[in-house]
Amino acid sequence: MSKTHLTEQKFSDFALHPKVVEALEKKGFHNCTPIQALALPLTLAGRDVAGQAQTGTGKTMAFLTSTFHYLLSHPAIADRKVNQPRALIMAPTRELAVQIHADAEPLAEATGLKLGLAYGGDGYDKQLKVLESGVDILIGTTGRLIDYAKQNHINLGAIQVVVLDEADRMYDLGFIKDIRWLFRRMPPANQRLNMLFSATLSYRVRELAFEQMNNAEYIEVEPEQKTGHRIKEELFYPSNEEKMRLLQTLIEEEWPDRAIIFANTKHRCEEIWGHLAADGHRVGLLTGDVAQKKRLRILDEFTRGDLDILVATDVAARGLHIPAVTHVFNYDLPDDCEDYVHRIGRTGRAGASGHSISLACEEYALNLPAIENYIGHSILVSKYNPDALMTDLPKPLRLTRARTGNGPRRTGAPRNRRRSG
């Protein structure tokens, strides 16, 4: 993490439980990010927090640090049963829940608090086995949490800490009724520490905070500009016929170390994957139709560097902590302006530079004015020479269950640059 993203405030300056400080410092966390410096004084004083912060600002460690400290500093509810977790962290997607769990593991190891994970699509019995042994902190998605609660595998009557991460995304995905169902089965708000984090503190998010929290303090960490000054943004206007060849040519030109390509539909993502896989790229596909075990494996391979390119729908644009992404390609301009910011926010993180390349084709160019108005600036337009685009490309692969990730290792060097001036 770059020092430019840190404050002078140290974790050791707070009255945090010694085991929490020890675990943080062991992982190299000494100074707070702005959101951590704002949140911790409030949560350590027992105040509820509703925070506005983008992914990558350190909000996950802010609420994890607060959660572990609170549980270590307060006794469990009397007569607590084995199926009663003490803290509940809700996330909108399986990937985000898994990531939060991974971030929490060093703290759990240092403190002895037990973690549980609950998400749909995979691992029902494996997750249940962990819950049956008793957990202190349960991290999960709302659907699976409700499933376990209805079958009495978990009981929320002993909850002392609640975290709602990516609250705006919860609304977007239609989970608000599930959230309210879960809250109704917990102790009253004034008997819990409540934390909510969201990329935007919209009216509906504030309404949720008012409804489910105890006089929450609002804190905001706004970037100087929504897209980040370390991200180079670039825009091309291809025809529909030239769009795929332009993407492949740009990939050969840029030769990204680690790139994410976003498209607006599952079908389009599969099409892009087929072309790139046929051309020998180490490319993975991440959409809602990919089985959960395979999704996690692909994310792990991409994070380790075994895959160079990830093709994804917006399911991967929120909450995933993938380090060192050098390039983001918007094959389709998103329909939602916020999704543009979330997509390109995968690169240029923690002080690193990044490159975002968007293709404004005939179908999605109409989304551009709203995006530029939202981010507050025009995106630099670059031209290309149609005659210099790659030709004689192999026939795209067809998607099968065995072909959603990995491929041959890249060899050689990128081809000569083909873009016109």
UniProtKB/Swiss-Prot annotation:
Domain of life of the organism encoding this protein: Bacteria
Main EC class the enzyme belongs to: hydrolase
GO molecular function: ATP binding; ATP hydrolysis activity; RNA binding; RNA helicase activity
Location in or out of the cell: Cytoplasm
Region (Disordered): 395-421
Motif (DEAD box) on chain: 165-168
Residue span, Helicase C-terminal domain: 245-390
Name listed for the protein in its UniProt record: ATP-dependent RNA helicase RhlB
Organism placement in taxonomy: Bacteria, Pseudomonadati, Pseudomonadota, Gammaproteobacteria, Enterobacterales
